[in-house]
Amino acid sequence: KAGSVPKTYSLYIGIPFCPSRCSYCSFVSCNLDRDRKMVQPYVDCLCREVEEIKAQADKAGLTLCSIYIGGGTPTSLSADQLRQLMGTVRENFDLSQVMEYTVEAGRPDCTDAEKLAVIKEYGATRISINPQTFSDEVLAGIGRKHSAQDILDCYADARKAGHEDINMDLIAGLPGDTVEGFEHSLRQAIALDPENITVHTLTLKRASRIVMEDQKENDYADVAAMLEKCHLLAEAGYRPYYLYRQKN
């Protein structure tokens, strides 16, 4: 059951591959360079599963109302693999009845203009570009293989491809970040003028590299001071609409 609309459901499609593993991440993901041979068989299986979900939903009299392709990193797929997957979705579902169709395009080191065009062409109505921070030093420290400038370039490519609903994620409390650094990231995101900005606090699970290697975390007081900077979002006209809570 999705929301209060009767006989509807939401579809989540997970892509468990990443160009590198972020130090804070505890999600299931495979290294793209090491496990590239697994990607195409996985996409083939996903397409068969999409077809089966459609068949079962029709039997149950259910209508699809939202789609979310997340990960991992969905844009670790090639442009052709994205066409295959999103084409299968489009062939099986009436996208005119879908209220929101999101694809995470979070990593600029594997998101290019062609992939952004494919995502738009095949019906996505919302994408998420997730810098987490605009500090090159912090990006390197958490295992990202790209720069802050790469994020800006990716965002520009997304607008050129016609994407009109873009979310950007930031994380307060990343190792090596400071209150001033987080404020800079907030201001940079606001300057880009995306439709949504999502701020998370760093939440660590046992499977994250930060925990396993016992890396130093930011003090609670520093994280609290970072969150106080979120008044900048309200001043820029952003209004909260989403609440997510998670226990460590």
What is each residue range found by the language model?
Residues 17, 73, 107, 245-247:
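Short, flexible loop/turn elements at secondary-structure junctions
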Residues 233-248:
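C-terminal accessory regions of radical SAM enzymes
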Residues 8-43:
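Canonical Radical SAM [4Fe-4S] cluster-binding loop centered on the CxxxCxxC motif
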Residues 29-228:
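Conserved non-cysteine loop/helix-boundary elements of the Radical SAM core domain that shape
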Residues 9-11, 65, 193, 237:
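A generic secondary-structure signal marking the coil-to-beta-strand transition
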Residues 1-11, 60:
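N-terminal [4Fe-4S]-dependent radical SAM core
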